Curated annotation (Swiss-Prot):
GO biological process terms, semicolon-separated: double-strand break repair via homologous recombination
Listed EC numbers: 3.1.-.-
Quaternary state and interactors: Heterodimer of AddA and RexB.
Protein name: ATP-dependent helicase/deoxyribonuclease subunit B
Keyword terms, alphabetized: ATP-binding, DNA damage, DNA repair, DNA-binding, Exonuclease, Helicase, Hydrolase, Nuclease, Nucleotide-binding
Domain of life: Bacteria
Keyword Acyltransferase tagged: no
Needed co-factor(s): Mg(2+)
Gene: rexB
GO molecular function terms listed in the Swiss-Prot or TrEMBL record: 5'-3' exonuclease activity; ATP binding; double-stranded DNA binding; helicase activity; hydrolase activity, acting on acid anhydrides
Family: Belongs to the helicase family. AddB/RexB type 2 subfamily.
Function: The heterodimer acts as both an ATP-dependent DNA helicase and an ATP-dependent, dual-direction single-stranded exonuclease. Recognizes the chi site generating a DNA molecule suitable for the initiation of homologous recombination. This subunit has 5' -> 3' nuclease activity but not helicase activity.
Gene3D superfamilies, alphabetized: P-loop containing nucleotide triphosphate hydrolases
Presence of keyword Transmembrane: no
Source organism per UniProt: Streptococcus pneumoniae serotype 19F (strain G54)
Length: 1091
């Protein structure tokens, strides 16, 4: 056993490589052992340090891989499971346990998070050389019982299936202990680099090999001052010094100091000594000069994006200044990898800097995982429509074109069907020939055939199920689709997809191993496959060696690269405080460690935090050979953050904090990094002028479009793809002639008028271009309204010999049997329930009709308007016709006055502000149309709400009071002629604000005609502004702004071109109500008509 240590500015790898070469010269086979996170880089570093640049006698590897290079004899043939296979084994065993048998974990026994934690605990106990029976020492009885039961069942299952338990290292330990290694130990040597602690398992291997006479060399970084100090607690080198002291004591071997004498103390050595002195409470006088501050820079940036841009610009500048440099000379360290991952790709692609982030990617969000998840959902939830749509949207199932998938989705949404039997029926329903049923049925068979075959599978052996799954993948064209999708991708992306497919196949292989010979149902198989894929990870290797390597800062080793940029070093990220998220608490770990024998040790993360983090900081400060940049943003993940206390210490020693900002106000040579970055800087430069004009924080793309749009305008050019603000063009004369020929009548409906005043462009989309809403066969608000209308129409048309209740029930029965409504409301149990609710509404609304002796109904569903009678005449002599349908016309028995009724599914009232602004013209239009048809005597126009009144019992003292309050809401709401109001009963809400004199009535009709005239003139002129109305002057209601994706109108940017509703100009600021409010609006109407 040979122990070495060196100062942190001397390469430990160089020293240990020389030791390895000497051992090779003596005829030894050397295993150069590095930690898992550093083995790839360490191999390259060792090769660079070798005098011959290569050696067949030195193998750079990890502890876990050593067994591959040793000859193991007479070991039983067992299949080894990785984490995926182990996860499947846990899933299988937990599925077989009754939830009642598990007191703590019963309710979540198949939760992926629990399975992941059980796998981690399984590995931890293996590494710590602890038996599962040691869990008997847990004090929590319920947890102890559960964990013992789970691990006993899993262990028994693994033994029964001849599946290897434990790690590769535990198998090597077992082989050495049982003398099953035929390799000559005298010819083997271990050189161990980069460790500051061994796991119990790793220490056991070292101990066994040392006992077999294997020569072992272990090196670590430590200062002589720290190693020889009698007190190491809190020291920067505490982790490595305690590690060396433990080994020196155990093997009775003093550690040798291999530190080199440096001609001059560099900036990083100076920083290290100052930090060490600060933590061991010794005094040290060192001056930090300008050169040191240049070599070790501390940046303070505003945002993470700015940090990355500054790093990219710095790398580009250094490459430009020094042609000998390449990307591999740079290293980027991240305080939090997840927070920087997306921005990193965006900005480094923009600056054309190749990089490699050595991080495994989870398969959980890959389309292949979503594909399996969708099939599982189809099976588990009995073929829901949404699950089938999700399956098709993965673009992996069947080779259908996107247009075919869209057509199929649109049709099944129209049908609203769920369940396999419904999909198996031939598609026959269409909407006025809109759907190509022949093509849709071909698509239906193509989509269903592979799924039907797969879902017909019963519980069977795993091998047979895998064969059926393989057939399904071929018939469903999944492999073909994956292949086609990857052919169009770049080489790097193709490699990623290849790794994903390998991971997918590996999950299937592990399933075959774990469930060999077992009976498995299809649903269990899909659930296991999805669970395995959710746990799976994949990674790619860099396409070229010359890339900027990016990694988490806590994985860094000293003297890694010439230039190192460490970003995101906020208080939350540096130091990283390891949290215990396992199934065992720190207290339980401590108790288990005390109860078990020596050499058996579970890691307690909280006890390692301090020494680990200080050693990490030391490695970070010494990670660069030439220049180090440490940066912290003021805003991290959109919240305020402070820089790390370690950075503040460096500033205290004399290093300077530099406020770094991206300066877009001027362009300099630093912007000449690459074509894309220069373009970005130019846009940002021009953006400054735009920002000072608008003072709005806009995104890059929007600013770019506005800048380019402005430049094109100055040169008299136009690019319709990038408008500076949403605008529409006036329709051409020939287009208008085709749409509205002079000899053809021009019709405008009351709903069209309302749409026009909501947003002129919405009228253009719906009534000119004919944009339609997605069709639905299932009952909706429209079909509900038609159903209720038909019931009342029929009830009021039946002879009066029978009572109203009998007529209503007869109308309900006859209407329910109509083919149209029978098809809709017998479709499903949900539709039947909806029908029962609607019938209750009909019976409740009938209460008003039953007890209203003052009126009689003379017409139902009465049409008005047509070619015979023009509604208004335009200034150019052209007539505008209005046609529509009135739900009901009533007549007062007393004097024959006419009233108009419109049924509504919710409470609707006539509002003067909305009427004045063109948003409530329905009732005045009905009255005007009937007047033009010869009617002169009116008592009003009103809405009748068809709904069951809801009354809070808390607001009334008795049930009788609730009935009274409910009946108050069941009234006709609308406009009534003052002279006829005395004839109207209690069912009419005839307060003063709703009553009109003859002069007000005529004024109402005149202003309504004026609204139609203004709208018709604009429509016939082909002018449709993008001007959704705003009621409060701050936002646009969602039902007004339904076509945002088409118009591009955004309220927070384009509110200036919205239509602000006209309001009363109240000089004294008083709020008017009732009749005074009505009079104020009529005064405003008079002013508008007199202009």
């Amino acid at each position: 056993m040979k122990l070495l240590y060196t100062d942190i500015r001397t390469s430990l790898t160089e020293i240990l490589t020389r030791e390895a070469e000497e051992l090779v010269a003596a005829g030894k086979r050397v295993f150069y052992i590095a930690p898992n996170s550093l083995s790839f880089e360490k191999e390259r570093a060792v090769l660079e340090c070798l005098s011959q640049q290569a050696s067949f006698s030195i193998t750079v590897t990890r502890f876990a891989q050593m067994a591959r290079y040793l000859v193991l004899n007479d070991l039983p043939v067992k299949t080894t499971l990785d984490d995926i296979g182990l996860g499947l084994a846990f899933y299988k065993c937990l599925a077989e346990l009754d939830p009642k048998d598990l007191r703590v974990y019963g309710a979540i026994k198949q939760d992926p998070q629990l399975i992941q934690q059980l796998i981690e605990l399984y590995h931890e106990m293996t590494k710590s050389q602890m038996s599962f029976l040691d869990l008997e020492n847990l004090t929590d009885e319920d947890k102890r019982t559960d964990l013992l039961l789970i691990f006993e069942k899993v262990t028994a299952y693994l033994n029964q299936g001849q599946l290897a338990q434990g790690s590769q290292l535990s198998h090597l330990i077992e082989a050495i202990e049982n003398d099953k290694v035929s390799s000559d130990f005298n010819q083997i040597t271990l050189v161990i680099d980069g460790f500051t602690r061994f796991s119990a398992e790793e220490e056991r291997v070292v101990d066994l090999l040392h006992g077999k006479g294997v020569e072992i060399v272990i090196g670590a970084y430590a200062s002589k001052k720290a190693y020889t100090s009698p007190f190491s607690e809190g020291n920067l080198y505490q982790a490595s010094v305690k590690f060396l002291h433990h080994l020196a004591s155990k093997y009775q071997t003093p550690a040798q100091d291999c530190s080199q004498t440096h001609e001059k103390m560099d900036s990083f050595d100076k920083a290290s000594r100052l930090l060490e002195s600060s933590y061991d409470f010794s005094e040290l006088a060192l001056d930090v000069d300008e050169k040191d501050r240049e070599n070790l820079q501390i940046w303070s940036c505003l945002t993470q994006k700015e940090e990355l841009e500054l790093v990219a610009r710095s790398i580009r500048q250094k490459l430009h200044e020094n042609s000998d440099l390449s990307y591999k000379h740079f290293r980027i360290l991240l305080g939090d990898v997840a927070s920087y991952q997306l921005s990193l790709k965006t900005i480094f692609d923009q600056y054309q800097i190749p990089f490699y982030l050595g991080r495994s990617e989870a398969m959980a969000h890959h389309p292949l995982t979503q594909f399996v998840e969708s099939i599982l959902a189809l099976k588990r939830y009995r073929f829901r429509q949404e699950d089938l749509i999700n399956l098709l949207r993965t673009d992996l199932y069947t080779d259908l074109s996107q247009s075919d998938i869209d057509a199929f989705e649109q049709y099944i949404r129209y049908l609203g069907i769920n369940g396999l039997p419904a999909f198996q029926q031939i598609f026959t329903k269409s909407h006025h020939g809109k759907f190509n049923l022949e093509r849709l049925n071909v698509l239906r068979l193509r989509i269903l055939a592979p799924l039907e075959t797969l879902f017909a599978s019963r519980k069977q052996k795993a091998e047979n199920l895998l064969q059926k799954w393989s057939v399904f993948l071929k018939e469903g064209a999944v492999t073909k689709q994956l292949q086609d999708l990857t052919t169009t991708l770049e080489a790097v992306e193709q490699e990623r997809q290849a790794e994903v497919w390998k991971a997918f196949c590996h999950v299937l292989e592990q399933f075959a191993t774990v469930f060999a010979g077992s009976q498995v149902s299809l649903e269990d198989f899909l659930a296991l496959l999805h669970s395995g894929m959710s746990l799976s990870q994949y990674r790619t290797i860099p396409a070229t060696v010359d890339t900027v390597l990016v990694q988490s800062y806590d994985l860094i080793a000293p003297l890694t690269a010439d230039f190192v940029y460490a970003i995101g070093l906020t208080q939350d990220n540096l130091p990283k405080i390891s949290q215990n998220t396992s199934l065992l608490t720190d207290e339980e770990r401590q108790n288990l460690n005390q109860a078990t024998e020596e050499g058996v040790q579970l890691l307690i993360a909280s006890s390692e935090n301090l020494k680990k983090n200080r050693y990490t900081m030391l490695s970070l400060v010494n990670s660069a050979r030439k220049q180090l940049f440490l940066s912290a943003p003021s805003l991290f993940n959109e919240s305020e953050s402070k820089e790390s206390a370690y950075l503040q210490e460096l500033i205290h020693f004399g290093f300077r904090r530099r406020e770094k900002r991206m300066n877009h106000k001027g362009l300099s040579k630093e912007d000449m990094g690459s074509y894309h970055s220069l373009l970005s800087s130019l846009v940002a430069y021009h953006q400054q002028g735009e920002m000072s004009d608008t003072e709005q924080d806009l995104t890059f793309v929007k600013v770019l479009s506005r800048v380019i749009g402005k430049k094109l305008d100055l040169q008299g050019l136009e690019n319709p793809a990038i408008p500076t603000s949403p605008s529409s063009k006036t329709l051409a004369k020939d287009t208008l002639q085709a749409l509205y020929p002079a000899k053809q009548e021009f019709y405008l409906s009351t709903s069209g008028l309302t749409e026009f005043y909501r947003n002129e462009y919405s009228y253009f989309l719906r009534y000119v271009l004919g944009l339609q809403e997605e069709l639905r066969l299932r009952p909706d608000a429209r079909s509900h309204g038609n159903f209720l209308h038909r019931i009342f129409e029929r009830a009021l048309q039946l002879p009066n010999e029978d009572s109203f209740d009998q007529r209503l029930e007869q109308a309900i029965q006859e209407t329910s049997q109509e083919r149209e409504f029978e098809a809709i409301y017998q479709e499903s149990l949900e539709a039947q329930f909806t029908k029962e609710v609607l019938l209750d509404v009909a019976r409740t609304t009938g209460h008003i009709l039953r007890h209203n002796p003052a009126i009689e109904t003379i017409k139902e569903e009465a049409n008005f308007g047509g070619k015979d009678q023009a509604f208004i005449q335009l200034d150019n002599g052209r007539s505008v016709f209005v046609r529509g349908k009135v739900d009901r016309i009533d007549r007062l028995k007393a004097n024959g006055a006419i009233g108009v009724v419109d049924y509504k599914s919710s409470l609707t009232q006539f509002q003067f502000p909305h009427f004045f602004n063109g948003l409530n013209s329905q009732l005045p239009t009905y009255l005007a149309a009937l007047k033009r048809e010869g009617e002169q005597n009116f008592f009003g126009a009103m809405y009748l709400e068809m709904a069951e009144p809801v009354q809070s019992l808390m607001a009334v003292k008795s049930l009788a009071g609730a009935v009274v309050e409910a009946s108050k809401s069941m009234k006709y709401q609308g406009l009534f002629l003052e002279k006829e109001s005395s004839y109207l009963g209690e069912f009419y809400n005839k307060n003063k604000a709703n009553q009109l004199t003859d002069e007000e009535f005529q004024l109402l009709l005149d202003y309504n005609a004026y609204l139609y005239k203004k709208a018709a003139e604009k429509i016939l002129a082909g002018r449709f502004a993008i001007n959704p109305y705003t009621e409060n002057g701050r936002s646009i209601a969602p039902y007004v702004q339904q076509h945002q994706a088409i118009t591009g109108f955004e309220a927070n940017y384009h509110l200036g071109q919205a239509r602000f509703l006209e309001k009363l100009d109240l000089a004294d600021g008083k709020r008017l109500v009732g009749e005074k409010l009505k009079q104020a609006w009529f005064e405003k109407i008079r002013e508008e008509l007199n202009r």
